[in-house]
Amino acid sequence: MSVVNFYGQLSNTQQFDQIRINIASPEQVRSWSFGEVIKPETINYRTFKPEKDGLFCARIFGPVKDYECLCGKYKRMKNRGITCEKCGVEVTVSRVRRERMGHIELAAPVAHIWFLKSLPSRISTLLDMTMRDIEKILYFENYVVVDPGLSILQKGELLTEEELQKAKDKYGEDAFTASIGAEVVQQMLKELDFPTLKQELYEELQNTTSEVKKKKLVKRLKLVEDFLESENKPEWMIMNVLPVMPPELRPLVMLDGGRFATSDLNELYRRVINRNNRLKKLIESKAPDIIVRNEKRMLQEAVDALFDNGRRGRAAKNANKRPFKSLSDMLKGKQGRFRQNLLGKRVDYSGRSVIVVGPELKLHQCGLPKKMALELFKPFIYSKLELYGIATTIKAAKRMVEAEKPEVWDVLEEVIREHPVLLNRAPTLHRLGIQAFEPLLIEGKAIQLHPLVCAAFNADFDGDQMAVHIPLSIEAQLEARVFMMSTNNILSPANGRPIIVPDKDIVLGLYYLTLAFDHEVGEGMMFSDLTEMEHALYNKFITIHTKIKYRRNQLNAEGKIVPVIVDTTYGRLMVGELLPSNPNIEYKFINKPLTKKDISLVIDLVYRHCGQKATVIFADQLMKLGFKYACSSGISFGMDDMVVPKSKIVHIDETQLEIKEFEQQYSNGLITYGEKYNKVIDAWSRCTDRVANDMMKEIAKPPVSDDSNQQKINSIYMMAISGARGSFQQIKQLGGMRGLMTKSNGQIIPIPIIANFKEGLTVFECFNSANGMRKGQIDTALKTASSGYLTRKLVDVAQDCIITEKDCNTDKGIEVKSIIEGGEVIAPLAEMILGRTAAINIYHPVTNDLILTKGELINESKLEQIESAGLDRIMIKSVLTCESSTGICAICYGRDLATGSLVSEGEAIGVIAAQSIGEPGTQLTMRTFHIGGAATKGAEVSSVEASYDAKVKILSRNVVINSEERKIVMSRNCELLLLDNNGNEKAHSKIPYGARLLVDEGDMVTKTQKLAEWDPYTIPIITEKSGKVLFKDMVEGISVRDVTDEATGIPSKVIIESKQYSRGAELRPRIQLLDAKGEIIMLSNGLEARYYLPVGAVLSVEDGVQISVGDIIARIPKESTTTKDITGGLPRVAELFEARRPKDHAVIAEIDGRVEFGKDYKSKRRIIINPVDGSMGLEYMVPKGKHVVVNEGDFVKKGDLLIDGNPVLQDILKVMGVELLASYIVKEVQAVYRLQGVKIDDKHIEVIIRQMLQKVEITDSGGTTLLVGEKIDRREFDEINEKAIKNGLRPADAQLILQGITKSSLQTRSFISAASFQETTRVLTEAAIAGKVDKLRGLKENVIVGRLVPAGTGFFMDKMRKVAAKLDEENA
């Protein structure tokens, strides 16, 4: 027995390592066939036997019954292999009817529709004709000149019937050859001489300058090369013989009423056979040409319908006007072969039922109803009954089980012991949606689930159902126990935080238990023993909330027990007793009212320091304690617990006064409608927050009462603050005010709902709020699908990302630093580098001690060292820079978040990344409607405050002092840094153009001091010189318009789009500043003082007035506010991963230099950047309506925005490189999720980005056979270049290209994976022509061909098989 077979699968499947797809030649089709199908008949409707030579013929396809010929002469096994001389049927198993094929010899050649119609059409590309022309030839509309002979006609020219006749008259019958139909196309394809054609095309490509022609030639050349490499013949795209599928795969079944249900394929095949037979007869009887031609066309159409119904012309329909399901439809889409049967199979040994809560279960257990267990474990029970001699045969055992005899239950108990079962809750959005448990037999019909795993399954008990699956083989049981047991899945793979965390009532119980109240009975007593305390509690000398002192034994760092006196309560000590003893887990972590966050932190600590077993026991005990006290605390709430603050009326009155003022300003024309709208929204947002804060303060206060029985703390407050249920958002609506509502388009209605639910809403308010609620409901319905689709695309693009080796030994890495926005640290450095590996040796900046060596994992203890060293940026390894030839190496990936240690080889990190990004998306779309449409938008940021006591440093400081002696920022990229005493950066903020600076360089500031302020709703245009205003190119009604506000009647001048007027095209509205002599003033940068005004700018000055430095001459209103929620977010995530161009995208400066405005061109503005060194400048043409954020003479850096908006990802890649592109995508995606409080580790997003950057575009082919403009896999490109260098040729040059995830999935190296994703026919057509080989490296293709996936345990089996094969070769 060879070593290979030792590791082979048990079934006798063929051993293969790769799969190749090709175009089938007619000879191949005939060799597959077991006979020709001549008749269109299926079965005889009287005898129900298949007709001879028909579509179900037993002679061709095999016997209908096992080991029995059709006429019944030969029966049973003994005659196996004999062919009956009477009916011609071979005596064998009927299973062969699933694999034996037939064929139809076509009377006329027929084009394969995939190669004709699947874009780009391969036949037309090869023949260099348009697809329309080829169709005209194939469908007998036009003739084509094959050989011009003596005429002046061109080869390949099309002629209609009349034109042909004229040409014949003109040149004579035999002067030239013209023909029609598939025969002529086949002949033309046959005549192609590929080597010569390749040479010609290559030369033409070198000589042509036209870009369009180049593209066309590259496409054609690529196709010719594909044919040459794959050894396919082009004439095979036209078929002379048609394969017939095995009959069992297109069955004909009898229904109850004697009618038959048949597969559509039979109907389609019948049409082909009918037309083919008719055509044969017509040709034999020498029918007129026109009739034969018509029949040939009909045959072509019948074959088209069989292969891809509806691709060309009208689809063939059945009697009920439904289109027939063709072969292509069998493969395509969710119901196709790939996704329905190969990637998703129905599973035997499974059951499903409703779930109920099982609080008395241990974490590794689940309750399984006896009835279900009996059914699921039947085979095991049978064998045990037989083994113990309780039943003599399997049949007897079966009867015993059906009768439910008492012994059966005893055997079931034994069978079930330590046999894990898998529980799955749909939708399975991440890998924690399927976990293994040990079953406990229970009465009833519902499955019992442990409360702590609900978060992972996202399960609740309002009628959810779950499925049970039984792992049968010992290996499957082992894997279930080792990898999938609920006790082994404590941490979430998305972020490495514990996912087995108490929730809801457990949290409430623990919070209540750990509360401490003043003036409780027995305050200040001292205890040294828990039993003594229990005694005191029992006799009512203390309560669980009494503040007491207690002597507690604690482990110190050396591991010795030290007694410590702690101020605590009995309740907290009960939690303390559960803590495992470890010096790192101090009592202080639980010596406070425990909220959900605190409990999560403690569980995390226990896991990190005491391991998994201790964590599981601790979590289980916590749960029991929490439930007990949630029950005995008797927490509930009534109407009176919702407190409406007294200050509410005051705040509302104040805000209404404020709004009156805005209305007044608007009436006076000081602000536009948009500005007023924004200010009103802001005012109401602030008011709502104030009311909510006051309400919170009142709720948090203990009730003032002498009644000792009254609860000391408000129940609603307790639920919210502990994180058990409800958010402050919701409480605000119960007792504060509901606040602003959103319209269905995301806009905020500027009239708030002043009432809360306790007071009740007025009819008008109720109507207003219905709008938002409906939005929530609709969002949930519509967005769930798009989120699921995003997850599918992500899984598809990343499915072949597997950890294949320990270390790729690269020196590359990426630099990370903490993300600071608006002076606030949003993502601290520690969070970003935990669980990653160092790319270089890292030293302490002061003492120069080595903190981390290259390739070392950064764990919690190393983090502390890095933080104490004050390092603010670090080089870490990343999957983006990993240089493994296949897959990714463990060192570049870092920690496996689900285990907390270095990732192991064979881990399918791509799928985990996709699930981690996709799962919260689905969750968040469902979360919208819980808040009920209340607008969740904070007031706009209009100032920046110091977050520390620090020293100010200002970068790009360019300031003017205006007439009010205020410092106005004139720089577009001014940044304000706060430095500590060592000069390390503590915070930095961008200060927008036009802001008032309240501090200056070198000032010392204190925490919360205001540093700068600005108007968040407009972008001002400010003068830096004083002078007289002169309007230029402002033509009333063409480039500027007096807009009179309907509500106020006050006019203001607004710049409008002028390109629709003939004389407006040249206008460039601007304001110039003149000095006393009437000459134009020069600015400090040597340019004239002229300010170009974009469309939509509102003028703040009149023509001819005198203005001073720092005055606003115009303002550009910003968009009015809409709410921010994940709906805005999910499409944004999809946009980033699909690498789409954003709608109003920014333009990025590609070089450093000074800005100059050139001459406009039609409706575009010309922006020129002139480098400082005087080399050639770069021009950008931007639409006039866009807001240009730079002014003439500004200095811009590479990567700065010239126009507002989201930058195009491809531009970032081109200008700033891979590292900055990656950090931009990571930052943007994280911003969406962070807004919803969802934590995802950066490395997951990086894995997806790596997959988007797989391809390069050839810019120079060097000495290789690559073509310029060809897109090819990065690794393939490196391999080709290595070969070229070895052979002494010049290597090719290429640039990295970014592809969206859909495109990336479709261009993956595996055609099986791509075909099962989308556009199945296109992918298969392309693969067949190129004769592609699938190496079966990814997960998907292995699932499809029915093998173990090369990840996890399968990775090692794969490795062993390869080693074994090598040994076999050596031994041979």
From Swiss-Prot:
Give GO cellular component annotations, separated by semicolons.
Answer: DNA-directed RNA polymerase complex
Binding note for cofactor:
Binds 1 Mg(2+) ion per subunit.
Does the record carry Transferase as a key word?
Answer: yes
Q: Which GO terms describe its molecular function?
A: DNA binding; DNA-directed RNA polymerase activity; magnesium ion binding; zinc ion binding
Q: What is its EC number?
A: 2.7.7.6
Q: Does the keyword field hold Transmembrane helix?
A: no
Q: Which residues bind Zn(2+) 2?
A: 808, 882, 889, 892
Enumerate the residues binding Zn(2+) 1: 69, 71, 84, 87
Catalytic reactions on record:
RNA(n) + a ribonucleoside 5'-triphosphate = RNA(n+1) + diphosphate
Its cofactor is:
Mg(2+); Zn(2+)
Chain residues that bind Mg(2+): 460, 462, 464
Using the record for this protein, list the coiled-coil segments as residue ranges, or answer none: none
Key words, A-Z: DNA-directed RNA polymerase, Magnesium, Metal-binding, Nucleotidyltransferase, Transcription, Transferase, Zinc
* GO BP term (any one): DNA-templated transcription
- Family, as annotated: Belongs to the RNA polymerase beta' chain family.
Which HAMAP family has this protein been placed in? RNApol_bact_RpoC (MF_01322)
Q: What does this protein do?
A: DNA-dependent RNA polymerase catalyzes the transcription of DNA into RNA using the four ribonucleoside triphosphates as substrates.
Subunit structure, per the record? The RNAP catalytic core consists of 2 alpha, 1 beta, 1 beta' and 1 omega subunit. When a sigma factor is associated with the core the holoenzyme is formed, which can initiate transcription.
Q: What is this protein called?
A: DNA-directed RNA polymerase subunit beta'
Q: Which organism is it from?
A: Rickettsia bellii (strain OSU 85-389)
